[in-house]
Amino acid sequence: MVTLRADEISNIIRERIEQYNIGVKIVNTGTVLQVGDGIARIHGLDEVMAGELVEFEEGTIGIALNLESNNVGVVLMGDGLMIQEGSSVKATGRIAQIPVSEAYLGRVINALAKPIDGRGEISASESRLIESPAPGIISRRSVYEPLQTGLIAIDSMIPIGRGQRELIIGDRQTGKTAVATDTILNQKGQNVICVYVAIGQKASSVAQVVTTFQERGAMEYTIVVAETADSPATLQYLAPYTGAALAEYFMHREQHTSIIYDDLSKQAQAYRQMSLLLRRPPGREAYPGDVFYLHSRLLERAAKSSSRLGEGSMTALPIVETQSGDVSAYIPTNVISITDGQIFLSADLFNAGIRPAINVGISVSRVGSAAQIKAMKQVAGKSKLELAQFAELEAFAQFASDLDKATQNQLARGQRLRELLKQSQSDPLAVEEQIATIYTGANGYLDPLEIGQVKKFLVQLRTYLKKNKSQFKEIISSTKTFTEEAEALLKGAVQEQIELFLLQEQT
């Protein structure tokens, strides 16, 4: 039998006492009362903050949204299938935040900034709050630089500036995503970082967009944030804020960014689902009372920074889906009132083969010509008015049998102007090509052509300018003005090509 001496026992006890650590940690905990439909009711958590992250026993994270007198309503960031009634929940003391870094460029991530493209982890040393306050008046300056979309109809008549918020609105299947993705493709070489946020879309649609970006080399300056239709409502609600936090990171580093929210109708629906399950009182169209604030606090984060802050910018292009062209519904009117203009896409124009199907009459940019280079202002200044007059005249001409020559000429000119605004998808045009195209139409050079020949001729003209008149591009790029020299070059090229084209068509 082993005998222990008294001094050995006292040594062991002394060591144990020295090793004993009296670290007292206060943890704010609660108990699950009920769970289901992506919502949990928690008893306890007396000191939890609104919007604080809470952690369940089995690892699921949630956000405390409803702070009531006898329980806390938590929305889950996962399916929560393993959460049991009576299990414990602890407050983390943190508000939702994500890691941010340059390494996110070219990646596809979810609303929690975790990669979902199967290309490994993303290293990041900094983090940003998902929800941060919008820049104040002093830290902004007015929008003055253009953000070229590559679409003639937009860049000439509804110009978008860096730091602007321009809504893209229309029915389903009218080409809203196509306008947004073409804008991203056109930023190649423009030193603009793009963030594309897909909310509640089919995974196949998102994959198609990502494939287009990869094929056209756009992923190197783009981040895709995707929460598809099968994601929990909480993550669909958070995705736009995650995208905004990433875009803000680059904006504060004196870079230009552009962010597309595709689309905010789905985010509002996800928020409505969460709010109704949390028993918040419903308002118009069953949306909660703060659905306006949901979108305003997101879109107000887009800004053009002042010179003191480095002149970075964040341009927001939110997309909203309408039902049968009803622009006066709740979410469309909300977002229209928040943004600095809207691009309205019409199903009738789309079905008539006018693509992009932009209704120039009710589309508007509240920044206007401040977001255009001088050359574009000089050439396209009257285009919108001419097209609006043409649309009015066309409607009237349907009922009139005999029209005078001047009216017939105006109708013919209008039809050709409308024709030159048509563009194929994923085929953005450089600004000098747009200027050449509009000048050709506005000055009547297309009048001798049949409407069906316009597109073919314009392709031929742009190819000729690129190959043989490169100085035209150089003048526009360097001076940003449509000088007399540039006009003379363009006029000569157009006249020469028209004659050549008509000869080719006759033979």
Curated annotation (Swiss-Prot):
Its main location: plastid. Transmembrane segments: none annotated. Keywords: ATP synthesis, ATP-binding, CF(1), Chloroplast, Hydrogen ion transport, Ion transport, Membrane, Nucleotide-binding, Plastid, Thylakoid, Translocase, Transport. NCBIfam families: atpA (TIGR00962), PRK13343.1 (NF009884). Disulfide bonds: none annotated. This is ATP synthase subunit alpha, chloroplastic. It catalyses: ATP + H2O + 4 H(+)(in) = ADP + phosphate + 5 H(+)(out). It is found in: Plastid, Chloroplast thylakoid membrane. SUPFAM superfamilies: C-terminal domain of alpha and beta subunits of F1 ATP synthase, N-terminal domain of alpha and beta subunits of F1 ATP synthase, P-loop containing nucleoside triphosphate hydrolases. Belongs to the ATPase alpha/beta chains family. The gene is atpA. The record marks S363 as: Required for activity. F-type ATPases have 2 components, CF(1) - the catalytic core - and CF(0) - the membrane proton channel. CF(1) has five subunits: alpha(3), beta(3), gamma(1), delta(1), epsilon(1). CF(0) has four main subunits: a, b, b' and c. ATP binds at G170, D171, R172, Q173, T174, G175, K176, T177.
